[in-house]
Design a protein with these regions (language model features):
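Perimembrane helix-loop-helix junctions
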Residues: 402-406, 434-467
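Transmembrane helical bundles and short interhelical boundary loops of multi-pass, membrane-embedded
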Residues: 607-714
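Hydrophobic, aromatic-rich transmembrane alpha-helices
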Residues: 526-549, 663-671
Length: 714
């Protein structure tokens, strides 16, 4: 902290109690950051579960589906003599039920069958591999004691104990590697009436892989609560330190938020209507099952793709679905967070983004309606399901809005809040990486502001809250998991995939331009229109240095955010077109800016207007060069769901391409001077020049002047 007024930045002055606030900002900030990092190694309570099944006396099967699919270990023991007396074609033990399609290929089966020579044998098979096939005569040997099967990590063994090894070692087998069978219970064809005497002593023991079924200890819970409170306190003290500029703080939610306009009513009404009748996303089914199974299993397990590993470190959003599933699994109820995100996204656009983009955006209704149209086009096509894209779309828009507010108000707290929102957006899904682009767009102005204020309050008082807020996501990542569990889940994801490199991004665009639900009309059109708007505003910005009628700084940063987001999208491990849903909010803001750019003199030139029309025709043509396909049952009864859209038997794409070619041709003729700069104005002049030849002498301009000046009223 500087001691002299000469060294203190102009306009920043200490206030009474500043030193106390500075000390507490340092203490609470670094304490919150330290406890967030510590959360991953704090102790947890892990439940170890074992399933023990004894065959007799009723031989009742037990259903025990495992969240992880495969156990840590499995042990089967059965006496030899009774085993030799089971009826023919009988399954003695199985880890999958009779009608399971993968009973032999995925499970473990002990059964009596006949071998290739027609002799009766007891066969032990695991995952399509026959470990043992021993004749019944061998089992009747008094030396044979028990069948012992042991499956554990790294090896699978099966043997009939008590028998001497023979040359072929037919009574013992071992298979290295992870050959543990899939287990959904213990099943048998035997009943109390058909089972031989003595077989009731058989046992099956399963140790459940419950490494992820853990809960925080009291120590961990207390420390995490302290860390969260310390983080919130550090933000409060940083807010107090923002007062060194002598200005009063702004309302967090301006009064204008409570006033609804006509466009607000239309957007909210469309979102509500589409919430009830609109199409869902392709992953809603398995995400709903994950949410329903999270309660009994004790954690959010991804059974669908990654062997029941937890949705961590990205996936806190699914915990919200878990809470909702405990109330009801009705589709409108489960998708209520999506609707809330949509409404909040539009309110941010209309109340934060539009005023920030300048005077013309505030006073002219055209940009607001255009932004609403593109926002709804994105939201209805991509964001009406259970996937996390709506949360990330809201997070990206809110991050950029907070950055702009921080720059406009010259306050640190909005910028720090933007860092926290960006972190939680990244924690909702890999596409949340786009929020880094929003932070990077305003980084220069924010760092300049931090350096200026650090000369008065010190660096530690600012960095402490920044670190605490940025690392607060770790409290959700390690709420009931350990660092080891999260690293294991990450390893499983990387090994099993899909985990595509950055240069695999072409697959996303190939899917978008493919004829499928991934590249349907509804998905392709908003993405291409967003790209067209991006090219338009970038061209005007490069030509004029700014967009007339729009604020220069926010306009440049918005362009940078969207361009950077498209760049960061290549680093996501999966390449699905539904990821484009994260652009819903930013695309709406870009549409507002694009309409303002159309009024500039750069685009007002006749040649450039025709080029814009040609680009729009190209977007329509490319968007309709596919089926109007939606996912699953949402495709029932949809027009053109199995054909390209057409009017009167003529495909729209051809009409659009022809129109685009005509517009491009006119622009070329104007550029070369063959046509005048404004063909419409030139045509009107030609018509006016021809009018005297069509009028009577009494109706000429000269006669009208003469008659008007005579004063004759007869």
């Amino acid at each position: 902290m500087r001691d002299t007024d000469r060294e203190r930045p102009l306009g920043l002055h200490p206030y009474p109690g500043m030193d106390r606030h500075r000390r507490w900002a340092i203490i609470t900030g670094f304490l919150g950051a330290f406890l967030a990092v510590l959360a991953g190694i704090l102790p947890v309570d892990q439940d170890t579960t074992r399933v023990q099944w004894t065959a007799g006396p009723d031989y009742a099967p037990v259903t025990a589906p495992l969240v992880s699919g495969r156990p840590l270990d499995l042990t089967i023991t059965a006496p030899c003599a009774p085993l030799a007396q089971v009826p023919e074609n009988t399954i003695v033990f199985s880890t999958l039920p009779q009608d399971a399609p993968g009973r032999i290929s995925d499970g473990l089966v002990v059964q009596r069958v006949r071998d290739a020579a027609g002799d009766p044998v007891i066969e032990v098979a695991v995952r399509n591999i026959t470990l043992l096939s021993v004749p019944l005569s061998t089992l009747r040997d008094p030396a044979c004691e028990t069948l012992h099967v042991r499956a554990e990590t790294g090896i699978l063994t099966a043997e009939f104990t008590g028998l001497e090894r023979d040359a072929d070692d037919a009574v013992r087998a071992a298979v290295p590697g992870s050959m543990r069978p899939q287990v959904t219970g213990v099943f048998t064809d035997l009943t109390a009436a058909t089972a031989p005497d003595g077989l009731g002593e058989s046992t099956v023991e399963v140790t459940v892989d419950s490494r992820y079924s853990s809960s925080p200890t009291l120590l961990k819970l207390v420390l995490m609560v302290i860390g969260v409170l310390a983080t919130l306190a550090s933000v409060v003290f940083l807010h107090r330190l923002d007062g060194i500029d002598g200005r009063s703080g702004r309302r967090f939610v301006p009064r204008s938020w409570s006033r609804l306009s006509g466009v607000d009513g239309v957007v909210i009404g469309v979102l509500g209507f589409w919430h009830l009748v609109g199409a869902n996303t392709s992953d809603d089914g398995y995400l709903l099952t994950m949410a329903r199974s999270a309660g009994p299993s004790g954690y959010m397990a991804n059974y669908y793709r990654w062997l029941g590993s937890p949705e961590s470190p990205v996936g806190w959003y699914y915990e919200i679905l878990r809470v909702f599933a405990e109330v009801s699994t009705a589709s409108p109820w489960m998708r209520l967070p999506t609707l809330v995100c949509g409404i909040l996204s539009w309110l941010i656009i209309s109340r934060e983004v539009v005023p920030r983009l300048g005077r013309l955006a505030r006073t002219w209704r055209g940009p607001r309606w255009t932004g609403a149209a593109l926002f709804l086009a994105f939201w209805m096509a991509f964001n009406n399901g259970l996937r996390p894209e709506p949360v990330i779309a809201l997070g990206a828009l809110l991050t950029w809005s907070l950055v702009e507010r921080s720059i406009a108000t010259r306050r640190l707290v909005p910028g720090v809040a933007a860092i926290g929102v960006a972190a939680f957006s990244l924690g909702a899904g890999p596409t949340g990486l786009m929020c880094v682009a929003a932070l990077a767009a305003g980084a220069r102005e924010f760092v300049r502001m931090v350096r200026r204020r650090a000369q008065v309050v010190g660096w530690a008082a600012i960095l402490g809250p920044v670190l605490a807020v940025g690392l607060a996501l770790l409290y959700t990542v390690f709420a009931d998991q350990t660092l080891a569990a999260v690293l294991e889940a990450t390893r499983i994801r990387t090994e099993l995939g899909p985990s595509l490199p950055w240069y695999g991004e072409k697959e996303r665009w190939e899917a978008l331009f493919g004829v499928s639900a991934d590249g349907g009309v509804a998905r392709r059109f908003p993405v291409l229109l967003m790209l067209m708007c991006l090219v338009l505003v970038s061209a005007v910005m490069l030509r004029r240095g700014r967009i007339p009628g729009a604020a220069a700084g926010p306009s440049r940063r918005l362009i940078g955010v969207i361009a950077g987001s498209l760049l960061f999208l290549v680093f996501t491990p999966t390449k699905w077109t539904h990821h484009f849903g994260v652009f819903a909010g930013l695309a709406g803001a870009l549409a507002v800016l694009a309409v303002i750019a159309l009024r500039s003199s750069t685009v007002s030139l006749s040649r450039n207007r025709w080029l814009v029309w040609a680009a729009l025709c190209l977007v329509v043509g490319l968007s309709t060069a596919t089926d109007n396909t939606w996912w699953y049952v949402s495709d029932y009864g949809i027009p053109f769901s199995d054909s390209f859209p057409a009017i009167g038997g003529v495909q729209i794409q051809y009409v659009a391409f022809v129109g685009g070619f005509v517009c491009l041709l006119i622009a070329g003729l104007i550029h070369s001077g063959i046509l005048p700069d404004d063909p419409g104005a030139a045509l009107r002049v030609r018509i006016r020049q021809a009018v005297p030849f069509l009028r009577t002498h009494a109706d000429t301009p000269a006669s009208r002047r003469r008659d008007g000046g005579s004063g004759d009223t007869a």
